[in-house]
């Protein structure tokens, strides 16, 4: 998947018809997980080069959709996706973005702890994201199954970026809660449709994902669970991603922060990137990028569970 190119005009037309003036419930009308987004029923998601996108870069945004975190998906639909795509085109930190949206929940309690769109390069990513179910539950158990996103990316994504060009994609999880320490065998089977010989820890899953993906997590420091308890959230994330756990103070700057961390990871100076944004966004991005080093990597191939 991933033909076509993002167009601000296409976005404006789509947004006017399907997003503007609508409530969250009116935007996201699904009341159950649709089969086409059920990871257990998906054999493989593909990001392929094409005439439109000859050097495709897969980018996954995996958003917590439990509790109040439906606000992330809503903000992406209202303007974030357009900002993300147009700024990547304009700034060119990576080539030819192919965007996938994931909805993340709790594999211990939720009916739909992971939902997965296709990789798309045009307005189809917005059309699919709008069909995700904002289940809104979460287990109330002090964590979410963000690692389901990493395990899917490691085992069920095939991309020309690493298979042909030796380049990694970008996987950014976003939320307000601590991360559960991996997934049990039963959870892996139920959520992903994969048979595993044993439970997998968060470190084991991350090691699999990091072979092909530049992995980051954005903590929404002033939202939901993290508000007043951000240290509890960081205590679970920082040991896993010490330099790639990003604290975001203002969710309105989410898309700009994602673009910025890609720029820095591709070699730009954090101070220069932050200064390139206007007004308060520059300050929010500068704070989010604190301590993040520039680094690059090469891809290595699809992962299999034994």
Regions found by a protein language model. Name each.
Residues 1-306:
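Acidic, low-complexity intrinsically disordered regions
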